[in-house]
Amino acid sequence: MIKTRIEEVQLQFLTGNTELTHLKVSNDQLIVTTQRTIYRINLQDPAIVNHFDCPLSKELETIMNVHVSPMGSVILIRTNFGRYMLLKDGEFTQLNKIKNLDLSSLHWINETTFLMGIKKTPKLYRVELTGKDITTKLWYENKKLSGGIDGIAYWEGSLLLTIKDNILYWRDVTNMKFPLVLPDESEQFERLKHHAIKKFDSYNGLFAWVTSNGIVFGDLKEKQMEKDPASNNFGKFLSSSKVLLNFELPDYQNDKDHLIKDIVLTAFHILLLRKNTVTMVSQLNNDVVFHETIPRHQLTGSNTDSNEKFLGLVRDSVKETFWCFSNINVFEIIIENEPNSVWNLLVRDNKFDKALSLKGLTVREIESVKLSKAMYLFHTAKDFHSAAQTLGSMKDLSHFGEIALNFLQIKDYNDLNVILIKQLDNVPWKSTQVVLSSWIIWNFMKQLNDIELKINTTKPASTDEDNLLNWNLNLKEKSNELTKFLESHLEKLDNETVYQIMSKQNRQNELLIFASLINDMKFLLSFWIDQGNWYESLKILLTINNHDLVYKYSLILLLNSPEATVSTWMKIKDLDPNKLIPTILKFFTNWQNNSKLITNISEYPENYSLTYLKWCVREVPKMCNPIVYNSILYMMITDPRNDMILENDIIKFMKSNENKYDLNFQLRLSLKFKKTKTSIFLLTRLNLFEDAIDLALKNNLIDDCKVIVNDEILIEDYKLRKRLWLKIAKHLLLSMKDIDIKQLIRTILNDSNEILTIKDLLPFFNEYTTIANLKEELIKFLENHNMKMNEISEDIINSKNLKVEINTEISKFNEIYRILEPGKSCDECGKFLQIKKFIVFPCGHCFHWNCIIRVILNSNDYNLRQKTENFLKAKSKHNLNDLENIIVEKCGLCSDININKIDQPISIDETELAKWNE
């Protein structure tokens, strides 16, 4: 319920018997005036009071009227001498251009523009403040009416004026020519017989006008309710205005103590001041919601019962606060919970949007307003789309089933979707989101199917072309609408449910759209493969780079689009070719079967599986297991084309990929499919040289035989090479006819590199071979044999001489030896000889290795010393034999290396000498 109370405001700056003349409040700026002074208080900081002494010319000149702009930055002052002044930024400015205009009413349009009504003459001016200057424009003048303009209301182009007992209304003056002439509407009421301080007020498009019989009030914002000139309601704005009759007011008596002194509008109520009583009446039902009398106060030092006179009511249109003031006091009228008290009345009057715009409503109240609005739009206004928009914004789902049923009964799936989508955006529960989203998808499918049915049943006649075009446009729009919904609500959808709904409705395009949006590449891939669209399938494979899917669909793609499939495989990183071998072999079998039908070898199709595996071997050899190499060779060997180029390619591949394939398996294949040269190559790799020679000879491949016997492996195996050459020679000599036998023999002997001789060939000559054919080779053989016998004889003689020399040396060495007695010491250091490595010279002197080296380094044999030093500096100690050869050249005692010690004195051991003297 609405709560209203009146609180007195303490104005500490007023002292003594100072009386107030005017009160204005704008944007929390409270303006109080006395007869000559203006006080300004910021209600946000009321302790600071700014006062301005009005520059009046004479003592009798006083402030007569005060008008404050909506934001409180401009104060317009009129004195009793007819002068106008502007107070802005603390400075007063004279407005001489309007000094001759007798102001009766004023309405601010904005902070610098206002409409000004003239007293006695019905004229309306538009005044614009430009700095310290003003510009005026005559908006209205009526020479037929008498009296001035009492009230002005203006809202977004709508204008309302009151002139004595007349009220004039213009629906929109924005594009009209000024000054205005005839109004769109006008009414005449009984003139107010008594004088009121203010008998008209306007606020945010609302207006209220005090007449003799009561208060006429309305709302300029309702001007757009009826725009059709042909309608019966067009031009009935004034007649639809409401009236609050005087007798509806409490304590009404037609005397001066109960007459209306001032009127102020709130958003939904009318505040009235009658003497010292404030009454508040609802604009919606004319009910009195507040009625209170303010106690009067006495002036200081006055002997009368009361000197307080209530002057008027004031509204702060920006902050929506309300005030009442007398000549000595200011009161604030505090209104609380105004929206909560009127929302149900607005709903009763079908003013739902206005009710929803109220501040402070509870969630339950808002939901109730929305439901009432939706039911009115659905059942009364038949505006199903607007009803759906309203219902969709509701959070209360208790009536949802009934609402949905209403739309289903009229088969309005489009507006039902509006509700469902809005509800989907609001509900936080996942389960509810799944239900709503699935329902929405089903509705979309139903709509799309219905549109397609109409398209299919519309005859393609010229008369139906427009309808057909419209249905196609509707189909496209609905499809776009579905796509937008899916894009914006993906996280609220259950993918499997959506798939099921679309699949059962056979909506393939929508399935593709949805799968693309959720990036379900598996579904898209499966779909395109089912449709046989290999291009799209491969494009998806390349995009997702999923190896498992590549392996899964490899066979069907390779069989139907081999070139593109292989190209795609090559682009996919880290693809394992070993896992594709089963697919490749199946493709190769199919390729073989197709190739059998082709008679012209040049028309053979390309084996793309072989192309791919060769690419793998070349580009990613580390990923290729032996099965890859075996598969390549298998396809090459079993190729129905049997030409030398193919065999050369096989052998070339084998040579470049040694030890990476199964030799035995490939040999069996080669023999089975009669790839002779390949078989020969494999036999040699298996060291089956005799079998290789036999196979080559069987096929009369003499050059291949020669290559075999010259293999590097056979270089050390003379006997095997000879056996192989004997096979070749036998074949040549026994099988060749009508040839030059003499030349053949020479060729065999030369090619064998003297492995064979004419003697080896003799068993292979037939009985018809003449000696003339053998003469030259026999002579050469005998000459060579004679030379070899001579060489052998010389070798025997040399061997005998060598034996004699060896025996002589052995005898000499048997005489050269020395016997060392136990305890033998080094001739240099005197220590036991056996504790270190030592050398014994033929002269019998013995030295440790290190001792003899020291002797050499201290000797005067510069040649020997230099050799020793160079060896030690070079640190070539790994070859101690070289050092030994150096140090054993001369004895350290009895050779010339010790000659530099001749001049040195002999050292005598005194202890030893004493022993000899005993």
Curated annotation (Swiss-Prot):
UniProt key word Repressor: no
Q: Phosphoserine modification sites?
A: 907
Q: Which Pfam families match?
A: Pep3_Vps18 (PF05131)
Start-end of each CHCR repeat: 585-741
Q: Which GO terms describe its cellular component?
A: CORVET complex; cytosol; early endosome membrane; endosome; fungal-type vacuole membrane; HOPS complex
Give additional notes from the record. Answer: Present with 2020 molecules/cell in log phase SD medium.
Please report the name of this protein according to its UniProt entry. Vacuolar membrane protein PEP3
Lineage, uppermost ranks: Eukaryota, Fungi, Dikarya, Ascomycota, Saccharomycotina
